[in-house]
Amino acid sequence: MNKFKSFLVACVLVFTISCSKNSSDSDNSDTSVNKSANLLATGDSARDILSNDNFDTLVIEIAYVTGFKPTESAITQFTDYLKEHTFKEEIELVYTELSSPSEDELTLQEIADLETKNRTVFNIGSSLGIYIYFSDAPAEGDDLEDGLVTLGSVYRNTSMIIHEVTVRELATLSSSINEADVETTTLNHEFGHLFGLVDLGTDMVNDHQSESENEDGQLVGDNHCNQMGCLMRAELQFGSSTGKSLQTNSKATYEDGIKSGCVLSGTTVLNLLQQNTAKGENTVDLDAECLLDIRANGGRN
């Protein structure tokens, strides 16, 4: 009898272990995520972001270095901007506090490496994942003396960097502009590129793309808007005796092998905000041409 009881206990134990192992294996299989859809070029997910064709929810990971969390006001205005221009029924925010990488400056390659290490939100089911990193280090190649500083950049279809330390420094340069103003404008501008603007995954209804010098000194389309006062407008920066844009060299240093959809300069944001402040307006909006483009690609307005 005792032997029979022992046999039953052994059978139950083996069955339990087997079930637990199978359950664990199933869980691991279910939680595995295909990250490839979040590693595409800037603008490749424009329609997916704007419309509800494939995804009805945006999950945005706000990854920030301790002490460099974006202001609540900026994030509220940013999510309002997304609701205004996309058909997403739900926008979820996931805050991830990170330790400092202890770097004096960051290149896009270093930023991408940090994303690989720290990102937790990806596309899954009907949810589209976005990653935004708020750093405590400026961009490689910044030149404070010449006023050439980078506030943010998009470098993949769902990836963005905001140089929060530089955002805060820029906000101190004007008594009429605060930290939230600079954060909001930077976030909205860079996300405009994830919308596919300008001609960066979302086709132009009418030609309104501005031009700037490339490395060879030729004027080429620069994926920004040529309409005055538009959020997606980029101001050219000249600071050398030859008149060649200093931004060309600093951008090449910053990109370091990774192509950026946009490297947003402090001068551009400061000019946009000061123009709007002079008109008594607090926010910088998309112009009519950009609105036409995103509507044609599945956006709201």
Predicted regions and their residues:
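Generic structural signal for residues positioned in beta-strands
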Residues: 59-61, 131, 159-161, 230-231
